[in-house]
Amino acid sequence: MFVRLTLADVKEGEMNNALEYVENTVIPSYDGVPGLLGVAACAANDGRFMAWSTWANEEAKDASIEKFNQALAGAGEMLAGQPVVTEGTMVAGQQYVAVSKDGEEGFFARFVLGGGTQEGKTYDDVADFMTNTVYPAYENVEGIYGTGACKVAEDKGFSFNFWTNHDAAHAASDLSLIHI
């Protein structure tokens, strides 16, 4: 699996327009694209626009990037600068509850964009820790949909988890604050 994460500053008063554009234009334009597993967007807690897409593999993402860029072009006027894109191969993950693509319920997403690993560790060590320690701890936690970790470089990556709501994520925050 391959994940592409985009963060962008949005012009004052344009966040709702940017989110509506993704929901009403970008996401529908991707219906039936081979290898695309999901697309979502939200307003991050730091005020930036955040969108992510998940793909069967990097090749599927690369094959559709032109269509993706065309679909996003209309959002350019709402942005206050050039978006920052981070992408990587998912090296660990766990789905706890299946959610239909037609689901109308919102959800809470938490992304952890790390600056790197501890000295002497690689992101493969992080993936092993997530798989063997964090994910089993989430097994009986209320409100979790799924979680994953993506490798960007040998010693750098990001992780994410999706919850029914902020309260569920906050209630389980002690589980996700374990460090290696």
Where on the chain are the PLM-derived regions?
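Short S/T/G/P-rich N-terminal loop/turn motif that feeds into the first structured element of a domain
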Residues: 1-50, 54-177
